[in-house]
Regions:
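An N-terminally biased module of ancient metal coordination in phosphate/nucleic-acid-related enzymes
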Residues: 1-78, 261
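Active-site gating/metal-coordination segments in enzymes
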Residues: 3-12, 77-160, 167-169, 208-219, ...
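H/E-rich (His + Asp/Glu) clusters that bind or coordinate divalent metals
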Residues: 4-11, 192-302
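Hydrophobic faces of well-ordered beta-strands that scaffold small-molecule active sites
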Residues: 24-29, 68-71, 94-98, 120-122, ...
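A generic "structured core" feature
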Residues: 25, 29-31, 138, 142, ...
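Conserved, mostly hydrophobic/aromatic
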Residues: 28, 60, 83, 112, ...
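Glycine-rich phosphate-binding "P-loop"
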Residues: 39-50, 67-71, 113, 118-134, ...
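Alpha-helical scaffolding within the catalytic cores
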Residues: 52-56, 104-107, 162-163, 190-198
């Protein structure tokens, strides 16, 4: 158990108050920069600062996290160079989730696979896309592209769109992963519209859910509402749950406008505290090991 103080990118992180399972994995992180090396997309909706592989390794080594998944961030569009170079630096401890489009070739997908990519992300929420027909079309297209590689589809979307895709998902052999609690709002409780569909899809074994970035879905990530929602999910299907920090925590600040041409500060999230909160939600060493180590090993082919 680590008791040393840890500060990364000027953000302090609490020491762990539980025994971290061996081969634990942070299933949702991003790497940005160096900014001089990787051009941003002209269609980005924010400008990130640098958050480099050495910073990520300092965080994970300090928190005893042995494995990591780099999710390609939206400001780079479909230019995956920054993420792929990060995977090359990480070696066998890293896996990746890319963002592609119709111009991405099969040869490029094969090359991504060799450096550790195991899925692609559909960033619907980032682009403000809530059209169910469009989402279904994208899901079918993406499945056709990645199924031959054995990859999964990761979707950033909300409960309503997720529910509209239920029939499509039930026809797929490709695993579907929803990140950030599928944007279920903690304060609306477990009876909120479409939460029952999320539970049903988890029960079917066709989808996975990331218990990531609770600050995105709760006014108080430590509060009773967030705890109730998380524990409901954990009790329901722990073998389909993953944990991710969302480091370095992009996403803007509530009430503050976003600027494409001005560096946006990352949210100062305490990831040690987030892990301790997860351990308190679970309160069972075997289930915690399943969420932090066993499940990621299966999904990401570690």
């Amino acid at each position: 158990m680590n008791t040393s103080p840890l500060t990364v990118l000027s953000v302090p992180h609490d020491a762990l108050n539980f025994a971290m399972p061996a081969e634990a994995c942070d299933c949702h992180t991003h790497v940005f920069g160096p900014s001089a090396n990787y051009p941003l997309s002209s269609e980005r909706n924010y400008m990130p600062g640098d958050a480099l592989v050495p910073d990520l390794l300092a965080l994970h080594d300090g928190l005893q996290i042995a494995r990591v998944v780099i999710v390609h961030p939206s400001p780079y569009g479909t230019d995956n160079a920054c993420t792929l170079d990060a995977l090359r630096l990480l070696g066998p401890r890293g896996r990746g989730v890319a963002v592609i489009d119709a111009h991405t070739t099969d040869a490029e997908l094969q090359a991504m696979h060799k450096v550790g990519v195991r899925g692609i992300r559909l960033n619907l929420e980032t682009s403000g896309i809530h059209n169910s027909d469009y989402a279904a079309t994208q899901l079918r297209w993406a499945t056709a592209r990645v199924a031959p590689l054995g990859w999964h589809l990761q979707m950033f979307t909300n409960l309503s769109v997720m529910a509209s895709l239920r029939e499509v998902i039930n026809t797929l052999d490709t695993p579907v992963v929803f990140d950030h609690f599928c944007l279920a709002r903690a304060e609306l409780g477990t009876s909120q519209p479409h939460f029952d569909t999320l539970l049903a899809l988890l029960a079917s074994g066709r989808v996975w859910l990331k218990l990531s970035a609770p600050h995105r879905v709760a006014q108080d990530p430590d509060g009773a509402a967030m705890t109730e929602m998380a524990r409901t999910l954990i009790a329901h299907r722990p073998d389909r749950l993953l944990w991710g920090s969302d480091w370095p925590h992009p996403g803007g600040r509530p009430g503050q406008p976003r600027h494409r041409d001005q560096v946006e500060a990352f949210n100062p999230i305490n990831d040690g505290h987030a892990l301790n909160r997860l351990a308190a939600w679970v309160d069972d060493a075997a289930t915690l090991r399943q969420i932090l180590a066993t499940n990621p090993a299966r999904l990401y082919d570690f």
